[in-house]
């Protein structure tokens, strides 16, 4: 594979007629190492962000061993990664996908309703080795793609679901997602405050907490707050929760790990003024 110092160097040397992928494995590795150093828990790469072998290899080389998978094809791909811990975090899954995932060794499943919980119990044969995550609906504040109306449960339904899931789970987790490309940490403040109320209402012991994804990357039209601000806000919010001191944490960065690691160089044949 040819190595060049920059996109400009490539254009000057090759004058490509067709689109060219620019790969920067060091960028993915740098981002992964930052999360592994700053976040005191499991860093699960959101597989759907980009599952190219190049990027997965760069993340694995930096130390990533947990993966947030959202479909059976993703699981069948990721299960080949040595020492991988897979978390099936899509809260709506087919019976076949649940059953096959369990056969492939997946023990971590997300849900946001009693119907989904019943499916998981039935398709795993009432297994007692499950890590079950209840996904809570939280507000999406300053996010490019809000998810609050798509997935999650709230209020008394959430409390009831937590109680029922506690009975079926070897480990019980809480998870949420503040929305994709969230540019300020405000959403995490609100989400963790909502979780505080829910834990008190349900009165159950939580074994794990997943703060989800939404961690941003920089684009020409998006200048998010520094990543350190997100981490400080999240960890401060966790400190206020009525959970055990040694609760195991997880986060699910996607674009924040890989957005700067790959680009596509294309030729523009014409433009009108400064418009593209």
Please provide the spans of the model-predicted regions.
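A charged N-terminal "starter" segment
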Residues: 1-130, 166-169
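Non-membrane alpha-helical structural segments and their capping/turn regions in soluble enzymes
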Residues: 25, 29, 95, 114, ...
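Active-site beta-loop-alpha junctions enriched in small/polar residues
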Residues: 26, 48-52, 70-73, 91-93, ...
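Structural preference for beta-strand elements that scaffold enzyme active sites
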Residues: 42-44, 66, 85-87, 108, ...
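Short acidic, glycine/serine/threonine-rich loops at helix termini
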Residues: 56, 79-80, 98-103, 120-123, ...
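Flexible, glycine/proline-enriched loop segments at strand-loop-helix junctions
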Residues: 104-111, 144-155, 178-186
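Conserved anion-binding
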Residues: 112-171
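C-terminal active-site-proximal or functional interface alpha/beta core segments in diverse enzymes
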Residues: 180, 184-276
């Amino acid at each position: 594979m040819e190595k060049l110092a920059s996109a400009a160097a490539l254009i000057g040397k090759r004058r490509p007629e067709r689109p060219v992928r620019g790969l920067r494995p060091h960028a993915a590795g740098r981002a992964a190492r930052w999360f592994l150093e700053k976040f005191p828990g499991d860093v699960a790469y959101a597989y759907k962000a980009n599952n190219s072998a190049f990027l997965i290899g760069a993340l694995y080389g930096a130390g990533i061993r947990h993966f947030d998978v959202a479909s059976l094809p993703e699981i069948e791909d990721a299960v080949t990664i040595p020492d991988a811990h897979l978390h099936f975090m899509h809260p709506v899954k087919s019976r076949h996908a649940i059953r096959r995932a369990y056969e492939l060794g997946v023990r971590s499943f997300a849900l946001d309703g009693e119907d989904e919980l019943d499916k998981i119990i039935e398709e795993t044969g009432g297994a007692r080795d499950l890590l079950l995550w209840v996904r809570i609906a939280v507000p999406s504040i300053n996010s490019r793609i809000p998810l609050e109306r798509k997935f999650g449960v709230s209020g008394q339904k959430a409390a009831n679901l937590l109680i029922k899931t506690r009975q079926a789970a070897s480990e019980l987790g809480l998870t949420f997602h503040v929305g994709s490309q969230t540019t300020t940490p405000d959403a995490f403040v609100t989400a963790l405050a909502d979780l505080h109320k829910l834990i008190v209402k349900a009165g159950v012991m939580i074994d794990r907490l997943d703060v989800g994804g939404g961690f941003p990357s920089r684009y020409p039209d998006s200048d998010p707050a520094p990543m350190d601000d997100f981490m400080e806000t999240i960890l401060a919010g966790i400190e206020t929760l009525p959970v055990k001191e040694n609760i195991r944490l997880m986060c699910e960065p996607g674009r924040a790990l890989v957005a700067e690691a790959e680009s596509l160089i294309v030729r523009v044949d014409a433009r009108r003024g400064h418009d593209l």
